Swiss-Prot record:
Presence of keyword Hydrolase: no
Gene: Kif14
UniProt subunit comment: Directly interacts with PRC1 within a complex also containing KIF4A, KIF20A and KIF23; targets to the central spindle. Directly interacts with CIT depending on the activation state of the kinase (stronger interaction with the kinase-dead form); targets to the midbody. Interacts with ARRB2; the interaction is detected in the nucleus upon OR1D2 stimulation. Interacts with AKT1; the interaction is detected in the plasma membrane upon INS stimulation and promotes AKT1 phosphorylation. Interacts with SVIL; at midbody during cytokinesis.
Disordered: region residues: 132-158, 171-374, 1618-1674
Subcellular location: Nucleus; Cytoplasm; Cytoplasm, Cytoskeleton, Spindle; Midbody
A Pfam short name: FHA
Region (Required for microtubule-binding with high affinity), start-end ranges: 391-772
Example of a GO biological process term: substrate adhesion-dependent cell spreading
Name of protein: Kinesin-like protein KIF14
Observed effect of gene inactivation: The lag homozygous mutant mice that lack detectable Kif14 expression are indistinguishable from normal littermates at birth. At P10, mutants exhibit an overt ataxic phenotype that increased in severity over time. At P12, lag homozygous mutant mice are unable to stand for 10 s on a narrow platform. Their gait is wide and uncoordinated, and they frequently fell on their backs while walking. These defects in voluntary movement control, posture and balance are accompanied by progressive weakness and failure to gain body weight.
Family membership noted in the UniProt record: Belongs to the TRAFAC class myosin-kinesin ATPase superfamily. Kinesin family.
UniProt GO cellular component terms: cytosol; Flemming body; membrane; microtubule; midbody; nucleus; plasma membrane; spindle midzone
Amino acid sequence: MSVHTSHSRHNIGSLEVSSSQKISASSGLVHSSRLELHLKADMSECENHDPFVNAGSKTIDINSTYVISACKKTRETPVTSDPRRLSLQRRATCGDRESSLLGSELGNRRTADTSLRLQRRHGRADYVGKWETLNPVGGNPGSDSASQASRTEAKGVNNDTRVLSSVVSVKDSNDTGLTRCKDPGPPVGASNEKVTVKDTNSRAPVGSQRQTEAMRSGHLVVQLTESKSDTPVSGGRNSHRGNAGKDTAKQVGTFGSSDTRTPVKCVLEHRWTPRHDPPPPKSPALSTPKNNGKDIPKHGSTFRSASSESRTPVKCVPEHRWTPRHDLPPPKSPALSTLKNRIASPRVKPRPKSSLFANKRESSRESTLPPEENSLVQKTFTEPDSLKVENSQVTVAVRVRPFSKREKTEKASQVVFTNGEEITVEHPDMKQVYSFIYDVSFWSFDECHPGYASQTTVYETLAAPLLDRAFEGYNTCLFAYGQTGSGKSYTMMGLNEEPGIIPRFCEDLFAQIAKKQTSEVSYHLEMSFFEVYNEKIHDLLVCKGENGQRKQPLRAREHPVSGPYVEGLSMNVVSSYSDIQSWLELGNKQRATAATGMNDKSSRSHSVFTLVMTQTKTEVVEGEEHDHRITSRINLVDLAGSERCSTAHSSGQRLKEGVSINKSLLTLGKVISALSEQANGKRVFIPYRESTLTWLLKESLGGNSKTAMIATVSPAASNIEETLSTLRYATQARLIVNIAKVNEDMNAKLIRELKAEIEKLKAAQRSNRNIDPERYRLCRQEITSLRMKLHQQERDMAEIQRVWKEKFEQAEKRKLQETKELQKAGVTFQMDNHLPNLVNLNEDPQLSEMLLYMVKEGVTTVGKHTPSSSHDIQLSGVLIADDHCTIRNFGGTVSIVPAGEAKTYVNGTHISEPTVLHHGDRVVLGGDHYFRFNHPVEVQKGKKLSSRNNLTTSEGPKDFEFAKNELLTAQRSRLEAEIKDAQLKAKEEMMQGIQIAKEMAQQELSSQKAVYERKIQALEAELREESQRKRLEELNNQKASHKIEELERAKQHLEQEVYVNKRRLEMETLATKQALEDHRIRHARILEALEIEKQKIAEEVQMLQENRGNRDKTFTIQPNWNSMKLSTMIQEANAISDKFKKCYIFGRHDASDKGRSDTSVRVRNLQLGISTFWSLEKFESKLAAMKELYESNGGDRDEDVFCDPADEWEPDITSTPVSSLSRRRSRSLMKNRRVSGCLHDIHPIQSMQSSHSSGLMEKPSTIYSNSSESFLPGICKELIGSSIDFLGQSFDEEKTIADSLINNLLRLHNGVIAISKAHEEQDEESQDNLFSDRAAQALTIQVACAFEQLVVLFKHWLGDFLPCTGSARLEDELRQDIKKLGGYLQLFLQGCCSDISSMVKEAQNKVMKIIQQAVQCVGQLAVLKGSKLCVLENSSKVSSTQEFMAALQDGVTSGMKSLLDSGLETAQDLRQDLSRQSAREEVTKQMKASTVEWVGSLENAVAEWRTKSFRTQAQEGSRQQVSKLLSLASEFLKLKSCLQQTVEMIVSALRGCPSDLHCLRSCTETICSLARKLHSDFSAHSASAGSCGNELPRADCEELESLAKSLLLCFECGESPGLSKPWESCSSNSKEEQCKSDRADCGKSGPRRACEPHGDATPAVSSGDCTPNRIQWV
């Protein structure tokens, strides 16, 4: 008996032996016990003592299927027999007998004889999504002798082992089987399988000389075969134990060389095979990438064990092993990692995999079925399961571009080099060499290089494999990354003559569709194109928004299944490559249109081009066609380039764009870094949502996608830092592992499985001789339920087809509409080469000359783009007038005529009269639209004006830079005058500020002088009084001579005291006079300094005026392009302010300080007399918001655009007369920075006065900072005490969050009024600040705390309630009101602090208005959410504020009206939904009619309640009526919820699903009860309000209850036992879930009922009448 491997050309090879041969074969293989050899192809493990494994360098584990020939002699030819006798089949294990009722029944009966059949094993190898094919090994495919193997010798060892000699066998011309010695792995088959033996005596020729020599040398070659029941080894997905059809391919190779022949001997090993073996582990896919499209292995197709001269024989020691009952899968060989790139992978066609139902019902394939039915079932069960899942790393390619023109001019040095797949970067400064290895490296530096990578090479190598994977059903993504100017857009889009990846991809896509599309396979494609700019998403395939408005940025959302998506993005159906070309052209021109008007978009954005391909495969089952859909999403992303601000010299809007781009790319880098760490086994957070770009690419990075990345780099040394950063970026991206799976339509998959199940059940039904009637009845019920599901899915498929057609028609209509709209905006798809035209010029070269405006014969009008505009050329922009200009074309002469004051420039010159245009002229409209005029006829005739020869022929191309410099040169004088005017105005304002400061100082010094003079007079008067008192005392002393002696001592004492007081007064008088003298000297010095400063400024003003008068002199200030842009932007801001009738004026402000000029924008509020200054960056951002407001024609946030609460407003001194200055006004002007800058040398009067005051005149001075330090702790202490008291209070007064919101709004209202009143009552001549008072400080802190609590409570309130109808809009309104309230509070406090009365009054009015709006919104939301307002019951707090209470009442009544409107709409929708349901039985028709009538009656009742509520709202209601409305709202919400639940149960019953009668009865009773109560309450409410409306008759309420009873009766008839039980048997799980949800919902509004099945157990149904009525429903 000889042992060898067997191969066949056919998928199923038959083995033919006789009965005696089988006995001898089995007994020859049994050692001491009678063990049977289990023939099973599975992955096995080599022994640890194998030198090839120990060396770690030679081979891998290979599955081997051994064929043992039952011959008496070694070289005996096997006996041939009938191939139909025996075939190898898989015996199903007990773990497979669990799928269905029939399957479990049939699985218990198994035949004793299981036929055996050897089948061809197919395999698959994976390497980055690529398939590889080896050269064929066999000879002529048609030759039978080519399939014979070389001779095999078997040697006996101790009479119980067999040694295998080298064998070569070939399956077909496409398979090569090369392997080494293997231990047989643990089989998975049954224990009673038979083994047949066969011997082959031929050798197959090989394809190459090396392989031929290796085979002739006699080395071991084993070809693997595997039956259908094999488990997967690699590249697939494991399922249950014993799954059928999971086949894979293993790598095979040869040992040896052409010099020697080394026999390799192995010993068969006996093992106990487990009954249930777990599937072996997956081994890494071993393959090599394609080599320029050739199927040649990269490192050869043979293995060598030692050297090419000699080989050492290797023997495997015979060994007996006991295998456990449940064996573990063998471990992976360590040699796999070292042989990944050195093993040739055969390309084989994967065999279809068995479906899910085939796995579950394996036990049902028995011999009891007829042969034709058995074959049909087997054919059905072997359908492929396309839900494949693969782990694949991101493929990274790097492309090196050539030098640019600038780099060639600068003679840049090359620092980037390639060597195969390795890229090296030589740093010129650090003298270091950096090496990087990627999957693919494209060298596009030199076209003469033999390895030059063209656009075709890049596409075929990188993008074409992604297209193949897309056809397999995987999502794919390709994105390009690199610095600005590295060639990303050229790689992705390309040029007309050299198209890039996207055009080639689309063209190849439709080419393959044309080849693959048949009558059974159809393809549908949809495309979208959008950009991400400054974290905003813009659809590039839509011209304008709804109702002709400006289209708004889109928002990103996330679907729980399909992942992130763009809400509202247009998806257009495309049927050919020309459609995609037109849409791409439209999208690119949309970008150009957007970038022309200097608005918030430009070409510096991330663009995402998406294709959604749906493959529909038609399957015919039982004569019916069913569709199976596979969807693939293809994302082609062109990322914006990263840049360094210092290198790009960007500023302003460009700087902001760069910051946004770098931010999104930084987030992308963080995501890639986190994913690379996650691939290494770490658990990290992936910040997808930090950027819009990464959120949208979530599935492409670490998700369900096959992703490739191409990094473009510059080879120049000047960009080495960016190059290294890009390469490191790409290196991290290689570590990302995606989990890609085939996107199969689950409905189609379910249809296929249901069809297979039906076929199986029908086959079982026809052979029911061994099945009892009870199981037969259950099978019929299952068939009926499956038919129901199948027909429902078919209806869904028909609906999907209809939607597809509608979407295609809408896409065509939209395309025509967009084309017409874009023709007016300059996007011309067809042009006449003889007509004159205008082409756009843009700062971005890629967007220049993208828009073409044809100038027709006659008059062409140009104006603003509006929905009602009829102009031939429509432009957008603030400075574009409604009727801007007209272009006349008569007789080949074209002239342009400006209209009114619209700004029109020709060759940089502002024109105000008709001007003739010539070929090449530059036309600028509105200051920001640049065009070049083309006249083909004039060029052909060679017309040239002599006056323009020097201008047109001596200069370069007329691009944007040329037009910009030309306009700047022509407008230089105007810009210089504007700059000088700004500087002159700034100097004049400075002089005015100095004059005001001088007069204020004069006033302060005069008042201080008067104070000192009064003090001196008081001291002199006191001195005189003291002298007079002394004289009187002396006279008294003389008169009282008799008391002289007694008073002598008193006299002396008095004399001393008088002397001391006199001396003191003299000293104080002298000090006061000295201080007055010092003050006069200081006053003189200050006035002298101010006068000198005034003269200096006057001289500068005079010099500026002289310069302005003398235009021929050279100016010191040279205007640049930024000055020109700033001038245009200021004009736009003033135009927008004027349109909205705002009192804001914008102007340029140039302040020179120590020779350094500081430019800013001054914002003046003429109404309030205040001004502030904006930096250029802030002005640009504000202008962008103004333009957005301008395009949307205003809105609620128009005031926020012009007035920023964070601005530091100050009094405007330009219109302030000095004579009207009061002390309070002077104090506010002192805070003006120009005035305070002039008075920085003057100390505060209080401190000077306190420094010289002493004695009797000394008084404590109060300074604000000191007082605040003393007051603030006490105020905080009181607030903490009030908070502690609040803890001890009961919650009777404040039970809901709505009450807390209203109380905080009331606190804000009262606090603002109190602070405003204190500000008004402040003395005009007082020098104290308002907030030096303790009460004002306390009020301010209370206002701040109340606003903080308001914000916190609002956020909590939104999270406590589920969204209801109409609440989303009110919540947004309330959020905006609170935001505005905070801004106006900031302005109010700033006005109080700055003592600007106009600002305080304006802010107070705004605050009061916003508070009333917020209170009204809270009232409406309280009604819609069913909240109570206890503040209405305890109205003592709000009784004093009538406006506040009126707003709350208006909100409650408006909310009630909205609630009734939503209830009416809900009832109408439910009635329409019921009308759309189909009913085929009489019972269901009656149920449907009763339900529709009942809902209609309830709808009429709601309409009547709405009418009464509206009448009540028109009258003035009391607080009690408002509280009554709130209670009515809560009851109405319960009624609405019960109505929805009831209709859902009835609709479910009409569709054939089970429902609970008890829950339905409870809901209907609750609805009738609530309707009766609401009717009486609304009637009483209307009567109390004085409304005289018609009441709903009581008969109508009774009719509502009667209809409800009729509905319940119909429902009971429909749920009778004979009709309901078949549904209960097939849908028990869904019924239990429905009952649980119904019971939970009914518990909210009615009594709890037990949701149990109605009726007793269903009697057995005979086979003759199995639920005929239910079948009619299908």
